[in-house]
Amino acid sequence: MESDIINTNLLKSIEGKKRELDAFRPFSPEIARKLDEQFTIEWTYNSNAIEGNTLTLQETDLVINRGLTIGNKTLKEHFEAINHKEVIQFLYDFVKKKKTLDENVILAIHKIILKNIRDMDAGHYRNANVMIMGAVHLPPSAIKIPKLMEEFMEWYYEHKSKLSIVELAGWVHYKLVYIHPFIDGNGRMARLLMNLILLQNGYPPAVILNIDRRKYYQVLKEADREQYNNYFNFIGRSIERSLLIYLNALKSKNDKEDRYGYISLQEATKLCEYGIEYLSYLARTGRLKAIKIRRNWMTT
């Protein structure tokens, strides 16, 4: 599919990897479970970190999967992690049941995001005007929000079959950020809604990395000036990264383990999209099949 706002070669690469991914379906329950677990941790950590949450990747895992409390971290940061995991499960269930997206679903997602954090605002459009720090765009006044969200849903249903999934997901994300319908949680809401679109269409969730936070905000600013190319290419690369992670996991599962033997985690980083720190953490916590030889973790 040709596109004026995303690099054509990038879009073709994404769609090619999606076809390759579809060829592996149905996924084995073990692989599907492990990928869901890894993406839930990474997605939760990065999306919250972009908004200023100081929980590390490992701490996020301890909070959402083991129910632990982290010293010197705020209660709000704990709830942000817990709530985000709950929303992700909500999205997976929503997709599995093939439900239809509407404003009530958006409000239900937001209610979970701010649960035990700002209960009075959770699941409600804002009734006050807001500013986005460092942005060139001033969000619309609160009185316009209901009408704008109604138009947003009309736009979505008009364009969902006309655009590529990558473009549709990118536009949904950008338009929600632009409207800024909530008093808090707009960034997380936009990224979750983008991923709901991807999941509904058989894509893995796209994780915008905290290390790319500055670039992320920069391309959003450019989009506010109606310069969309860098923004959509940024979103496209995030989607492609997730596809690569899925494909590498599925291909590794299909290969005979004794064909390769054990390799170091440093070598493994060249075969996947994860860094040495994250692979080491997965090995230590038993989420990555690995053995320790002397002082070094080795994996297949």
Question: What does each model-identified segment do?
Answer:
Residues M1-D184, R188-T300:
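FIC/Doc superfamily catalytic core
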